[in-house]
């Protein structure tokens, strides 16, 4: 076999993409608690790394194939998670027009986009921390904001990939054993 990963790992990668879409949509659009995405990155990788090998029916064979399957599915899941997360971030960053519920003080006075997001951070009491980080206006805030977003994205990909490797390792240790030579397997 000359393929880098098994067919089951490719299928698992698609399942991981679906899992990533579900997680990101749930915790950015429905219940906006972004930290949950970071917390779920490692367990998502563990699940998908194990599933990639179970789906491939990798009962026997070299460890490097088992680990490659898990890493592949973990990377695909992590990249999908980050891609969707960044798309949502771009949408909300550049489309922010300063609207705020009247019960919270009404609309923020700002120019649409980065300036409104910057003003929200200032209103939330983060001005001193931003100033210490060298952020003094919407332009410097934009650079700071996206550096932080890409650093977080790298962390999510790393955790999901590490989880994929861990899931593959767990599968390799606890995988079903191949039937003994000459034994009869009953199929129902």
What are these regions (language model features)?
Residues 1-17, 150, 154, 160-176:
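Cytosolic juxtamembrane helix and N-cap/initiation of the first transmembrane helix
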């Amino acid at each position: 076999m000359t393929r880098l990963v098994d067919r089951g790992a490719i299928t698992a990668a698609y399942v991981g993409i679906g899992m990533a879409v579900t997680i990101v949509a749930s915790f950015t659009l429905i219940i906006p608690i972004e930290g949950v995405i970071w917390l779920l990155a490692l367990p998502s990788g563990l699940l998908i790394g194990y599933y990639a090998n179970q789906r491939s029916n990798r009962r026997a064979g070299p460890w490097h194939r088992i680990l490659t399957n898990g890493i592949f599915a973990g990377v695909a899941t992590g990249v999908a998670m980050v891609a969707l997360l960044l798309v949502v971030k771009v949408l909300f960053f550049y489309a922010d027009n300063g609207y705020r519920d009247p019960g919270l003080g009404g609309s923020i006075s700002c120019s649409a986009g980065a300036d409104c997001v910057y003003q929200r951070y200032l209103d939330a009491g983060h001005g001193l921390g931003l100033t210490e980080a060298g952020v003094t206006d919407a332009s410097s805030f934009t650079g700071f904001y996206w550096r932080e977003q890409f650093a977080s994205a790298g962390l999510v990909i790393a955790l999901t990939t590490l989880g994929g490797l861990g899931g593959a390792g767990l599968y390799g240790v606890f995988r079903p054993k191949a039937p003994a030579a000459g034994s009869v397997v009953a199929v129902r």
